[in-house]
């Protein structure tokens, strides 16, 4: 029920990664990457399918060898989400996965060989309508740039990116997006700002090697949040040393927090104090787990007392305000006569949320059993 944030998106060219539109004002796509051994086809497919269930738009798969390329063929046949092949050094791998239907090539043109090899990959991408992602990383800058700048700097990352962009420009290929990632938040942010001012290609955002589930999510939220709030970014990946499923969840949470793209429930909950009339933390944790399948956007406020509860409920799709034994219930900002038994709060609220989702989105039209007071 809150109004969308007044963020003006940077104008960028339109490309397609599979059927996913990227750039030109399209919804910001959430990407992740498998961390299985690609030659373990069953494990990789299983992980991609888990990512699909939580809403991933694009999945990147490392393809370091020709054996991995053969495995990629089998993986591609078993999943629906667009796949990006991450390739370095050996141009023949890029040609092989193109033959197998890859949706995007993540390469740096400058590190896959001489001009002839680069041209063969670009021509193959052009002939098969395959976009390319140029991926610059502060940890793997060219040696001459390290010597020139002394250390990774925004200017160094920009120069590296523009080298690869210039190669594609010379080959008259413009179906590409670019990333300039760093593990340092401010280095990454400034690098993206510089790049955004130089080219109009779509930009893929990420704070690389951000860390574990908690610290990595924090770094990514700060860095990507700054860029997204400035209208910069067309796809994103949250790089975590954790289950890739968590990357997708954090990515959508960042987009939801900025009200850029909504998917699923945005829970608004108090941190609790001695005024709480029911177990807020337990209720929120339980509902987050139970309702992961709901993709319909809605705000649900769960507040333990009447200090802030009514105000939050007024601007939420559904809201609960803690009361003695029974708690007040709101729909679309209107207080209902119905009150929830605090002991049955989780089941009652889950039922109401599912009923609301069914009303808002026909894809959720399922039988909903309401819990009696």
UniProtKB/Swiss-Prot annotation:
Belongs to the IspG family. The keyword Ribonucleoprotein does not apply. Its cofactor is [4Fe-4S] cluster. NCBIfam families: ispG_gcpE (TIGR00612), PRK00366.1 (NF001540). Pathway: Isoprenoid biosynthesis; isopentenyl diphosphate biosynthesis via DXP pathway; isopentenyl diphosphate from 1-deoxy-D-xylulose 5-phosphate: step 5/6. Converts 2C-methyl-D-erythritol 2,4-cyclodiphosphate (ME-2,4cPP) into 1-hydroxy-2-methyl-2-(E)-butenyl 4-diphosphate. PANTHER family: 4-HYDROXY-3-METHYLBUT-2-EN-1-YL DIPHOSPHATE SYNTHASE, 4-HYDROXY-3-METHYLBUT-2-EN-1-YL DIPHOSPHATE SYNTHASE (FERREDOXIN), CHLOROPLASTIC. The keyword ATP-binding does not apply. Pfam families: GcpE. Keywords: 4Fe-4S, Iron, Iron-sulfur, Isoprene biosynthesis, Metal-binding, Oxidoreductase. Binds 1 [4Fe-4S] cluster. GO terms for molecular function: 4 iron, 4 sulfur cluster binding; 4-hydroxy-3-methylbut-2-en-1-yl diphosphate synthase activity (ferredoxin); 4-hydroxy-3-methylbut-2-enyl-diphosphate synthase activity (flavodoxin); iron ion binding. SUPFAM superfamilies: Enolase C-terminal domain-like (SSF51604), Nitrite and sulphite reductase 4Fe-4S domain-like (SSF56014). This is 4-hydroxy-3-methylbut-2-en-1-yl diphosphate synthase (flavodoxin). InterPro entries: Dihydropteroate_synth-like_sf, Enolase-like_C_sf, IspG_bac, IspG_bac-typ, NO2/SO3_Rdtase_4Fe4S_sf. It catalyses: (2E)-4-hydroxy-3-methylbut-2-enyl diphosphate + oxidized [flavodoxin] + H2O + 2 H(+) = 2-C-methyl-D-erythritol 2,4-cyclic diphosphate + reduced [flavodoxin]. It comes from the Bacteria. Its EC number is 1.17.7.3. One of its GO terms (biological process) is isopentenyl diphosphate biosynthetic process, methylerythritol 4-phosphate pathway. [4Fe-4S] cluster binds at residues 270, 273, 305, 312.
